[in-house]
Amino acid sequence: MSDKIGLFTGSFDPMTKGHVDLIERASRLFDKLYVGIFYNREKSGFFTIEARERIVKEALQHLDNVEVITSQNELAVTVARRLGAKAFVRGLRNSQDLDYEADMTFFNRELAGELETIFLLSKPAYQHISSSRIRELIAFQQDIADYVPQSVIKELERRTYEKN
């Protein structure tokens, strides 16, 4: 098993082009990168966990060393240890992200001091994109093609088709 294993977690509800860019960049740093879709069955997401898994797998299928996993109601440190990960990978768009991620990093270090956290800065083109903004655009029936991978568009079309 490789020593260079990373874990990039998120809810990906929905995945954005910013997520894809960060994962592509992170995949070059590790022999194996797990992308963990973390969710809580008690909370309802915009997309089902199954839909998110389809979206993420399709968007990342070109990355040979990336594996998509799901985790329900588990701490990220527990999953990281189980997978043999040495580091978390987190994206930062702005200072608010840094504040949140720094707190999470300190907490994770208390629970699992052996795990490092690597921060990647979002490219300027993606700094304004967030999943919550995308959900808002969808709610107002705005075009989101510039902000999300094609797999999100396909999933929205599938959802529309299934409703009709």
Curated annotation (Swiss-Prot):
Question: What subcellular compartments does it reside in?
Answer: Cytoplasm
Q: What GO molecular functions are on record for this protein?
A: ATP binding; pantetheine-phosphate adenylyltransferase activity
User: EC number(s) in its UniProt entry?
Assistant: 2.7.7.3
Catalytic activities = (R)-4'-phosphopantetheine + ATP + H(+) = 3'-dephospho-CoA + diphosphate
Question: Which InterPro entries is this protein grouped with?
Answer: Cyt_trans-like, PPAT, Rossmann-like_a/b/a_fold
CDD domains, alphabetically? PPAT (cd02163)
* Root EC class: transferase
Per the UniProt entry, what is one GO biological process?
coenzyme A biosynthetic process
Keywords, in A-Z order: ATP-binding, Coenzyme A biosynthesis, Cytoplasm, Magnesium, Nucleotide-binding, Nucleotidyltransferase, Transferase
Q: Highest taxon of the source?
A: Bacteria
Its Gene Ontology cellular component terms are: cytoplasm
Q: Where is this site: Transition state stabilizer?
A: 19
Q: Which residues are recorded as binding substrate?
A: 11, 43, 76, 90
Primary residence: cytoplasm
Write out the similarity annotation: Belongs to the bacterial CoaD family.
NCBIfam families linked: coaD_prev_kdtB, cyt_tran_rel
This protein's assembly is summarised as: Homohexamer.
- This chain's protein is named Phosphopantetheine adenylyltransferase
